[in-house]
Amino acid sequence: MPKPGPRADSRVSRVASATVVATAIRHHLQTFLAFSDYTSANVRIFGQLPAAVRQRNLAARRRYELLWDTIIERARTGGGVRPAVDTATFRLFLLGAMNATLEWFDPARGDIDRLAARYADLVLDGVLTPAGGME
């Protein structure tokens, strides 16, 4: 049986990258929304806390940012994130979008996994149709 060529390997890497990002999105939203009282307060008032309190929480925030940077870089290495995409900007965009769900998403009335799949679709496959094409 012939060995898969580089194109097949590239598709497999992209699927693996997409799975890593989609899984991270799902876990973030599941955890974030499950502990919404704490996370809501943390996200909304962090900048207003006294410097000493912010400083005590900063290490945990930095570790979480580093985790997301690692996820993004792993996806980039697998061919799932364009080389020109700035890791920090992508992380801030993604976390900001997911954290904003506190404002409008009600886990009692909606499905978190469905929401995560929609976010992953937007991030991984984009919004616009391919240039010159129509869907």
Regions found by a protein language model. Give the residues of each.
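Hydrophobic alpha-helical connector segments
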Residues: D9-Y38, F90-L94
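Amphipathic alpha-helical segments used for helix-helix packing
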Residues: L33-A52
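Conserved hydrophobic residue
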Residues: G80-R82
